[in-house]
Amino acid sequence: MAPAGILNGKLVSAQIRDRLKNQVTRMQEQVPGFTPGLAILQVGDRDDSNLYINVKLKAAEEIGIKATHIKLPRTSTESEVLKYVISLNEDASVHGFIVQLPLDSENSINTEAVINAIAPEKDVDGLTSVSAGKLARGDLNDCFIPCTPKGCLELIKEAGVQIAGRHAVVVGRSKIVGAPMHDLLLWNNATVTTCHSKTANLDKEVNKGDILVVATGQPEMVKGEWIKPGAVVIDCGINYVPDDTKPNGRKVVGDVAYDEAKERASFITPVPGGVGPMTVAMLMQSTVESAQRFLQKFKPGKWTIQYNKLNLKTPVPSDIAISRSCKPKLIGNLAREIGLLTEEVELYGETKAKVLLSALDRLKHQPDGKYVVVTGITPTPLGEGKSTTTIGLVQALGAHLRQNVFACVRQPSQGPTFGIKGGAAGGGYSQVIPMEEFNLHLTGDIHAITAANNLVAAAIDARIFHELTQTDKALFNRLVPSVNGIRKFSDIQIRRLRRLGIEKTDPTTLTDDEINRFARLDIDPETITWQRVLDTNDRFLRKITIGQSPTEKGHTRTAQFDISVASEIMAVLALTSSLEDMRERLGRMVVASSKKGEPISCEDLGVSGALTVLMKDAIKPNLMQTLEGTPVFVHAGPFANIAHGNSSIIADRIALKLVGPEGFVVTEAGFGADIGMEKFFNIKCRYSGLQPHVVVLVATVRALKMHGGGPTVTAGLPLPKAYTEEDLDLVEKGFSNLRKQIENARMFGVPVVVAVNVFKTDTDAELDLVSRLSREHGAFDAVKCTHWAEGGQGALALAQAVQRASQAPSSFQLLYDLKLSIEDKIRIIAQRIYGADDIELLPEAQNKAEIYTKQGFGNLPICMAKTHLSLSHNPEQKGVPTGFVLPIRDIRASVGAGFLYPLVGTMSTMPGLPTRPCFYDIDLDPETEQVNGLF
């Protein structure tokens, strides 16, 4: 018989490594920035372990796998090792890891406990009980196989032997080689016999094997004469035996007597150079397979989401009754369904979570989805249902059209919740749930804004007080205190010195003039624009006197409280793009001017770093869900008059990455299109760089009747008869407002879909008239929507229209160039969006325009603070007013947020409580902890 063919593990493993290298390259081409990750956890410092690990690290580097070696000292305890295992389980950059055995610790460590703590999806060594169980059951495509048996199988296949139907004999039953080898051969359809130290007539059993795998750890235990002629022999042994002819006095042999066996076998593995190289190659292959599974599971845009089925009732129950009738999914499950990693999500109970900005960094190379903004016509005081339409639309796109879709909405203030309006989370069968969580504390973002805002306010008045009561030297010495005889500037103080043009870092070298310039902000109290805030409607805080305590030595001034969401910090949160950007914006916020007319910022006050600390969690978007189980980001809620009235850029950007290129992100702009949409485009999109694909313009028959000359609509009172009976003439006259808002949206080059929000008193003739006129005057489409009563099903036609519109040509453009003068930018908005003949800058506004231009703020975008109840400055003028000049009473600056806001009329920034606030109905069931009466 001819000598056996040699199964060269070095050659086969080299071929496998080349194949893996190509696979890694292709993965990185498909997902830029992605690299398969392998970690090796070692306890102790055994020489043999160090050798094996170095071989693995080198192989990983050659293939393109990022390998990390974590080496723990011999003093490590079991709990310390387990902490590292858990950490690696949660590290998304590690797709597989192994615990190098044996564990070389001076403490007792349960190896089984450590191995079984490895997440099965990362168990690339295939040693956990879960992996072993799946292999034993034949779930070969859903588990990792121990590397040595896996390599042995590759070598058997390399021999060209058909495994199915052959008799295979495995000598050895270890958990690492023998037992899994038996299972692997069995599920490749061999008839398998496992032999071990207690097997009788071992030689005769071995002689039955067409395929023989030996893993006993006994040098040359299996003799050549035992082997069936023509068998394939796989020798897994590595043994050292004495050999005087070798320089080190020993040689390596396997578990099979090689020289004898090769005369009877058809193929045989040498030792070394057979199974050994294959073990390392299989570890690399399993790591690449794990990375591929990770990409498949977390591929952007590939969601495995389950939707909730609504149980619709007629008549439609109350919002809170509907909210409680639907059990929300666990928020952690929803996060996984939409492709978020465990370490990217911070759970706040079972129904809300924060999403870390690291998700955006992970997905930064992925294409964005389609971007949709929901706006409305000039509304009645009752509102026309933009929020409800937003939620109904995403439920239709997701639960009914099976599109990946995210809603991004503003977080409501608690003020209205306990005041007159009540909560806000959509309505009917189109809601964000749980409503109680949505409308109360949520995750504390508004509380963080309140704390940060009031820290600035406290810093302003304290600084004025201390400057008025101390000499330059005393003030400087307290600002730069001596610690152990040494004075040292803080980082923020060094930045102030740089802005002052003082290039010094040693406090002792400043001249008297430099000390004066550094220490004194010299704030002019009459110019302070920063107010304290509270998230409660409190009319008696609209104007207050502060500093009346004797300890303030008579330094009083008139001030006020605003509602928390009116704080510039809320606008900063909504417009920021990163932690670094937020830090810079918070520092740029201007709170007053000096007596020389120079702007005083939070950076000058030295408080910007502390503000960033207070806001570090608030910057993370809040994840919730709709009634039908689609995801919602609830993040930021700036005013829509003195601010831009849109949810956060960060939430939109993360959502656009998560939905994938075929998915949709639907966000809402506050008030009518002339205010919220205009600011969405000219401020939010300008800063984010994002380009919307579709505008959804919400209209109602009742609002059109109002604009057509219908009676006054008053919140809290029944609708006049004209609004509950058919009147086509009134609707057609009022269409002028909708026509103008369609025109406003198209001015930005984006397709417009009109969503006619249906009320039970609307007639088909009225609804058809609105739809027909909308299409005739430039809308891409106009559809009737019944999502309040029917959930996503009622917005199905709207969702289909949005899908079609998103494919239509668009040429997004901004309304004005930032380099224009402040006055010209205001004029463009007034004339083109509102239809004004011109603007009039009143003296205070003219003065502010000159000051801001001089201070370098003239190139900021414009955020008009105007009534939302009319296109003009007069809330009583409905339809499309003409022939008016828009009066600009004042101009103020939100420098940190990044806009100037001209005041058209008087803006209330602190609501008051009515005679009978909502809180009369609110209570808690002490047994169930259920909130009652909130809606």
From Swiss-Prot:
Active site: K56
Predominant localisation class: cytoplasm
Region (Methylenetetrahydrofolate dehydrogenase and methenyltetrahydrofolate cyclohydrolase (D/C) domain): 2-291
Binding site for ATP: T380, P381, L382, G383, E384, G385, K386, S387
Record's keyword terms, sorted: Acetylation, Amino-acid biosynthesis, ATP-binding, Cytoplasm, Histidine biosynthesis, Hydrolase, Ligase, Methionine biosynthesis, Multifunctional enzyme, NADP, Nucleotide-binding, One-carbon metabolism, Oxidoreductase, Phosphoprotein, Purine biosynthesis
GO terms of biological process kind: 10-formyltetrahydrofolate biosynthetic process; folic acid metabolic process; heart development; L-histidine biosynthetic process; methionine biosynthetic process; methionine metabolic process; neural tube closure; neutrophil homeostasis
CDD domains linked to this entry: FTHFS, NAD_bind_m-THF_DH_Cyclohyd
GO MF annotation terms: ATP binding; formate-tetrahydrofolate ligase activity; methenyltetrahydrofolate cyclohydrolase activity; methylenetetrahydrofolate dehydrogenase (NAD+) activity; methylenetetrahydrofolate dehydrogenase (NADP+) activity
Pfam families, per database record: FTHFS, THF_DHG_CYH, THF_DHG_CYH_C
Taxonomy, superkingdom: Eukaryota
Reactions catalysed: (6R)-5,10-methylene-5,6,7,8-tetrahydrofolate + NADP(+) = (6R)-5,10-methenyltetrahydrofolate + NADPH; (6R)-5,10-methenyltetrahydrofolate + H2O = (6R)-10-formyltetrahydrofolate + H(+); (6S)-5,6,7,8-tetrahydrofolate + formate + ATP = (6R)-10-formyltetrahydrofolate + ADP + phosphate
Annotated positions binding NADP(+): G172, R173, S174, S197
Modified residues (Phosphoserine): S318, S413, S490
Residues the record lists as binding substrate: Y52, I53, N54, V55, K56, V99, Q100, L101, P272, G273, G274, V275, G276
Positions carrying N-acetylmethionine: M1
Known EC number: 1.5.1.5, 3.5.4.9, 6.3.4.3
Residues forming coiled coils: none
Pathway field: One-carbon metabolism; tetrahydrofolate interconversion
Subcellular location per the Swiss-Prot or TrEMBL entry: Cytoplasm
GO cellular component, one term: cytosol
TM regions (residue ranges): none
Record family assignment: In the N-terminal section; belongs to the tetrahydrofolate dehydrogenase/cyclohydrolase family.
Subunit structure: Homodimer.
UniProt comment concerning the protein's domains: The N-terminal methylenetetrahydrofolate dehydrogenase and methenyltetrahydrofolate cyclohydrolase (D/C) domain carries both the methylenetetrahydrofolate dehydrogenase and methenyltetrahydrofolate cyclohydrolase activities.
Protein function: Trifunctional enzyme that catalyzes the interconversion of three forms of one-carbon-substituted tetrahydrofolate: (6R)-5,10-methylene-5,6,7,8-tetrahydrofolate, 5,10-methenyltetrahydrofolate and (6S)-10-formyltetrahydrofolate. These derivatives of tetrahydrofolate are differentially required in nucleotide and amino acid biosynthesis, (6S)-10-formyltetrahydrofolate being required for purine biosynthesis while (6R)-5,10-methylene-5,6,7,8-tetrahydrofolate is used for serine and methionine biosynthesis for instance.
Protein name in the entry: C-1-tetrahydrofolate synthase, cytoplasmic
